[in-house]
A protein has these predicted regions:
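Charge-rich amphipathic alpha-helical interaction elements
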Residues: 1-141
């Protein structure tokens, strides 16, 4: 009977280790997700600033020299290029977030699996102990 209890205890420890590993993995994934969200907020701020700068570069009925027009066009092209690069980075972040969400769902399923196994082994251990106690008391009687 003690041998059976020791095997069940070993199973309980193993499931607790796997559960802890799942928790650690989930924390790591959530931390990475937070970093991505922070990056995206920074990119949004940069986009907002670049778009406002782009709006300021519009020539609204002003009399300007030809060189000023070319200068403004170069500035606008640079700003538009920066906006395109930021949008590309935001797309990469969105793709990574999708992957992270899938990994998080998988880890949550694994965590649930190991938690249920652990609970099953704990219930088994209590049943074994009850059986052991009832067998011991019936032998005494």
């Amino acid at each position: 009977m003690n041998e059976l209890l020791s095997k069940v205890n070993r199973l309980i420890r193993r499931t607790a280790q796997r559960l802890a590993a799942c928790e650690a993995s989930l924390q790591k994934l959530n931390a990475e997700k937070e970093k991505l969200a922070e990056k995206e907020r920074l990119y949004d701020m940069q986009l907002k600033n670049l778009k406002s700068l782009l709006d300021k570069k519009e020539l609204l009925g002003e009399v300007v020299f030809r060189q000023d027009i070319f200068y403004s066009l170069r500035k606008v092209a640079v700003i538009q290029q920066q906006i395109a690069e930021i949008n590309l980075e935001k797309q990469k972040i969105a793709e990574r977030r999708k992957i992270l969400n899938k990994e998080i769902v998988q880890q949550q399923a694994q965590r649930k699996h190991w938690w249920l196994k652990g609970e099953k082994y704990v219930r088994l251990k209590t049943r074994i102990k009850k059986t052991f106690k009832s067998d011991a008391s019936s032998r005494r009687a």
